[in-house]
Amino acid sequence: MKRILTGITPSGYPHLGNYIGAIKPSLDLLDGKCESFLFIADLHAVIKVSDPKKLEELSNAIAMAWLASGLDPNKTNFYRQSDVPEITELAWLLSCIAAVSYTHLR
């Protein structure tokens, strides 16, 4: 089974680039033959957005853009990155055993 994994960093309000670069291509790939994981990469945004209320506002705006573009949350795994503690746990474990240069795929 094919899998799709992509996310959008809520470092600003949704724009055409988000739609053309991530939302539309992802929605075009969705069918009953693939498992999809589409997310809001809010952990990636904390270096650019320091105000928690603003980050929540931008995260909600990104979620609304996905949904307004036709995403059916009943047919995909749609989540906020910070809601999955295993992501930060894995990042911490990897940072303990691997240099950053080894974590980049080539």
Which residues are covered by each model-predicted region?
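N-terminal catalytic cores of NTP/NDP-binding nucleotidyl/phosphoryl-transfer enzymes
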Residues: 1-58, 94
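Short Gly/charged-rich anion-binding patches and loops
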Residues: 24, 61, 89
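Short, internal active-site loops enriched in acidic
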Residues: 43-45, 83-86
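A glycine-rich helix N-cap at a beta->alpha junction
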Residues: 59-76
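Active-site acidic/histidine clusters and adjacent loop/turn architecture
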Residues: 79-80
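Charged, often glycine-rich, active-site loop that binds/positions anionic groups
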Residues: 89-97
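Short loop/turn segments at secondary-structure transitions that flank enzyme active sites
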Residues: 100
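Conserved small/polar residues in nucleotide/adenosyl-binding loops
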Residues: 103-104
